[in-house]
């Protein structure tokens, strides 16, 4: 009797895509959650410059391109059998590979992301597509121009995979974790007890600052740490203020002091 085996390469390619829609769908199922929103529902509907149907189509296009490149990358770097013979699982090895991958992808994305803001042509024709979402929401996290998706996410992910030396099996967990983190950073909510808000300075409020007009030259770091913003002077501190009609609002510290 023939058995059907799903390879780690297949799972490493498609599990993060499934995780993206499941995790962002969870936020949709939670409802409006007005008292935890960083922007009102009215602002979300009125300020964003792209329809939600266009966002879904854009994300699906990017994920299709990522899947194709992931399959090619896994084919080039070897099979499950090769990985199994060269790596023995240990928590220490897993932690080391995760940390290296996080640092690599953060470094790559910071400098590419910042350059897309500095270069007027790239911003106008490519990166501005992501900034059509002035009020971010969960499933808009990967709404980008296809070329930006290739440069920022796909190549960044490939480099983190290669430099960390992780196996396809480890990649399943790392890229699923990175996907959850990215979706959470764009969820537009400040939920009590959210572990990403507790353990990471780079979170939904931090990234929300970057999506506002006053913050487009700051807070480029994504998706894990804020080190490059701090080192290179693009870190914009902010305060989280309660709105009178419910929810929260991010305000740059400089503006808060002047008021």
Curated annotation (Swiss-Prot):
Extent of motif Histidine box-2: 127-131
Catalysed reactions, as listed in the record: a dihydroceramide + 2 Fe(II)-[cytochrome b5] + O2 + 2 H(+) = a phytoceramide + 2 Fe(III)-[cytochrome b5] + H2O
Entry GO MF terms: iron ion binding; sphingolipid C4-monooxygenase activity
A GO CC annotation given for this chain: endoplasmic reticulum membrane
Entry keyword set: Endoplasmic reticulum, Lipid biosynthesis, Lipid metabolism, Membrane, Oxidoreductase, Transmembrane, Transmembrane helix
Motif range (Histidine box-3): 206-212
Its membrane topology: Multi-pass membrane protein
Residue span, Fatty acid hydroxylase domain: 98-234
TM region positions: 10-30, 54-74, 91-111
Cofactor or coenzyme needed: Fe cation
Sequence motif Histidine box-1, location on chain: 113-117
Gene Ontology biological-process annotations: photomorphogenesis; sphingoid biosynthetic process
Pathway, per record: Membrane lipid metabolism; sphingolipid biosynthesis
Xref: Pfam families: FA_hydroxylase
Entry-linked InterPro entries: Fatty_acid_hydroxylase (IPR006694), Sterol_Desaturase_Related (IPR050307)
Major localization class: endoplasmic reticulum
Described purpose of this protein according to its UniProt entry: Involved in sphingolipid trihydroxy long-chain base (4-hydroxysphinganine) biosynthesis. Can use C18- and C20-sphinganine as substrates to produce C18- and C20-phytosphinganines (D-ribo-2-amino-1,3,4-trihydroxyoctadecane and -eicosane).
Assigned protein family: Belongs to the sterol desaturase family.
Free-text domain note: The histidine box domains may contain the active site and/or be involved in metal ion binding.
Protein name in the entry: Sphinganine C4-monooxygenase 2
